[in-house]
C-alpha cells in the first residue's frame, strides 16, 4: 500500500441532503496504519460458501473474506467453526459461478488452545465435483494441519464447478477455519 496526495471534493451536508435519497458514509483515515484497501476479487472470494454446520456466532463468509489472520487464535477477524460438533467429519464447500480451473488451495486453521475447545483438525482432504460425484484431487503435497500459517496443497490441475474440503475433527475437540484460498 502506498500513500499519495489526493484531491477530494467536500459537499456540505445541507447540499448533499437534497440531492437524492440514500445513506451518507464518509471516512477519511488520519492514520495510514488503520486504512485498508479492498483486495481484488479471487476465485475464493467470488465463490458461494456452504458448510456442514456453522456455530451461531460464526459465519461461513469468513472463509473467503480475504482477511489474513495474525495467528490461528485470531479473534479480531471473523471465523467459521463447527462448534459444538466434536470428533465429527465435517465439510466446507465453494461453488463457482462457472467451470473454473484450479491447481492449489491453502487453509488457515482456527485453534484456540488455552482458552477454548477448537483445534486444528486430525486430517483433511480436498474433493472436486464431477457431475453428481465428489472425487479426491490428486495432490502432490501432504495435507498440513499446522497452526499460525496457511497450509497449502498443490494438485493436478482440474476444471470444476465446486470443491469440498472434508475435515475429520480431533477426538473430543471441535475446529474451524479462518481463511480458505484457491488458485
Question: At which residue positions do the language-model features occur?
Answer:
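Aromatic, loop-rich ligand-recognition surfaces of beta-strand-rich domains
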Residues: 1-39, 73-183
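Predominantly extracellular/luminal regions of secreted and cell-surface proteins
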Residues: 32-73
